[in-house]
A protein has these predicted regions:
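Short, well-ordered secondary-structure micro-motifs within conserved domains or adaptor modules
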Residues: 34-58
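Redox-cofactor binding/interface segments in oxidoreductases and associated redox assembly factors
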Residues: 46, 66, 153
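A short, gly/pro- and small-residue-rich
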Residues: 54-71
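Conserved acidic residues
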Residues: 40-42, 62, 149
Length: 254
């Protein structure tokens, strides 16, 4: 496809976004505007963490190209300097650019409200430093139970954030879901890398627990209420090819 035929959107409202829009025009592509009902693009540059999360939860027709995110994203200067290569990578292999499919999680609380997550899903006690008991049901191993302030389930995009701070590993695209206890009561509690589906529940009635999705509180969770977290969709994205290995953390791959 010729550059002039490409429909490219840049989502964001700061100076970085304007820089990218100028680069898209200079590269000869057609700059388009996306709305909640119109996402017909060949590529969408998303500027910043929040914008990228929203785009992944509400994917466009074409590939998402994250810019200015902590990981799995390009820097603004790199994206502008490699604009033609990024367009080329939409159709063929380009050195230093990887085309991936990123998992989007559906979070089913057993109520009519079904949520979507791009980065992570956490169950945490409503008040800080309050212990509850949680269980994790996996598809390929026995159920795990532990006492902690909470538990977080993260996609590769979110694995370097809250889950990593809680002791979970950073995983590359296609590496599965990270499951990490938050401030566990006992030492020696593992983090896990799971497949595409886990079920989390609260096993004690003492402390109120809230459901946090991509950093926002979405619901309260009652005792023994199963929260099903499952990959139900994958979104195409262009990201920088990894050049270094993440530092090792103890984990168990399922």
């Amino acid at each position: 496809m010729g550059e002039s035929q490409r429909r490219v959107a840049v989502v964001g409202d700061d100076d970085r976004s304007e820089t990218l829009r100028e680069a898209v025009r200079d590269a000869g592509a057609r700059l388009v505007t996306v709305t909640d009902t119109t996402t017909d693009t060949d590529a969408m540059f998303t500027v910043g963490e929040d914008v990228t999360r929203h785009a992944l939860r509400n994917p466009p027709a074409g590939a998402v190209i994250p810019v200015g995110t902590q990981r799995l994203g390009f820097g603004v200067e790199e994206a502008t300097n490699r604009m033609h290569q990024l367009f080329e990578a939409l159709d063929s292999s380009v050195e230093g650019i990887s085309r991936i499919t990123h998992p989007i999680l559906t979070v089913d609380t057993g109520t009519p409200s079904v949520h979507r997550a791009a980065a992570d899903v956490a169950l945490i006690t409503e008040k800080p430093a309050r212990i509850s008991e949680f269980s994790i049901r996996f598809t390929r191993r026995p159920t795990e139970s532990f006492r902690a302030d909470g538990v977080v389930v993260a996609t590769p995009f979110g694995s370097s954030e809250y889950a990593n701070a809680a002791g979970g590993p950073i995983v590359e695209p296609g590496g599965g879901l990270v499951v990490a206890p938050i401030a566990p009561f006992s030492t020696g509690i593992d983090a896990w890398v799971a497949a595409e589906h886990v079920t989390v529940s609260v096993e004690r009635e003492t402390e109120p627990v809230v459901l946090v999705i991509d950093g926002a509180i979405r619901d309260t969770v009652g005792p023994y209420q199963p929260i099903d977290i499952e990959t139900t969709e994958r979104v195409e994205a262009l990201v920088p090819t990894a050049t270094t290995e993440p530092r090792a953390r103890r984990s168990e791959t399922l």
